[in-house]
Each structure stands twice: as C-alpha cells, then as structure tokens.
C-alpha cells in the first residue's frame, strides 16, 4: 500500500478522527458473530495505520465498541525507526532489519525495534531525522529515519 492507497475499515466512533494512528491488533472473540467483521478485519495484524478520511457519520453497532463504529479510509502510516548510518539516504529503498541489539533498557530501544515493522519488509526512507550515534548504548552507528512500508 503506497501513501495514496487506502482501505476501508471500521473503527470505534470515539477514536475516529483524521490523522489518528493505530496498530491493528486483529480479531477478537466478539468479532466471530459480527456481520461486519470482513470490513473490520481487512487490515494486517500488528501493522501501523493512519485514518485519512471518515467515510460517513453512520454509526454501526459493535460488540466491542460501546459507542459503535464508523467507516473510515486508512493508509499505512510511516514508522520512525533506526537504520545503519551508511544506509540512511532519503529516497533509498531498503529491506527492514531491526538493530542487532538486545539492550531493552536503552532509551532508544523502542526506536530501534518499533511496533508495526517486520524484519524483511520492503521500505522506502522518506526522511532522515537525526544521528543516534551518541545515544546508542551498543556503539552502533545509527540514524533515526521515517520509513514508508
């Protein structure tokens, strides 16, 4: 899905606002009996999405969301992470590799291991943000980047 590609899905009416980013968690037991589940569950679990447009203000009943759900257009949301400094070139296409570091106590751990990306994802570097060299506890030369996947 490119930036201009969208999918229609349903989201809780209290959450439905343009610009909202969320990680799709997947099917819940309550979804099995819902007649709208195919629309709700057409996203990839564990991935980050962004609401780009509210399709209508018609509220649909939902077994999970007490205030119902609204139809929205979503696109894949860019994800901020780190890459090796030598690969951090705006416009470059890369295969995502999480940093080879297991230091969970590091202040940059979540940047280096973001939710929503999977090892091997084909991504494009849309923006190079900053050097993480002075922040990396493992001594790896890294740059913070924004990736489109």
Curated annotation (Swiss-Prot):
Belongs to the UPF0179 family. This is UPF0179 protein MM_0589. It holds the Pfam family UPF0179. It comes from the Archaea. InterPro entries: UPF0179. Coiled coil: none annotated. It comes from Methanosarcina mazei (strain ATCC BAA-159 / DSM 3647 / Goe1 / Go1 / JCM 11833 / OCM 88) (Methanosarcina frisia).
């Amino acid at each position: 899905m490119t930036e201009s590609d969208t999918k229609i899905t349903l989201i809780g009416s209290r959450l439905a606002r343009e610009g909202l980013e969320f990680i799709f968690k997947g099917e819940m037991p309550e979804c099995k009996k819902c007649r709208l589940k195919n629309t709700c569950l057409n996203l990839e679990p564990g991935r980050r999405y962004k609401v780009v447009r509210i399709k209508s203000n018609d509220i649909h009943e939902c077994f999970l969301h007490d205030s119902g759900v609204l139809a929205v257009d979503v696109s894949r949301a860019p994800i901020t992470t780190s890459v090796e400094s030598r690969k951090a070139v705006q416009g470059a296409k890369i295969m995502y590799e999480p940093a080879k570091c297991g230091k969970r106590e590091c202040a940059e751990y979540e940047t280096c291991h973001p939710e929503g990306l999977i090892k091997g994802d084909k991504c494009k570097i849309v923006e190079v943000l900053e050097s993480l060299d002075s922040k990396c506890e493992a001594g790896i030369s890294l740059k913070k980047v924004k990736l489109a996947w």
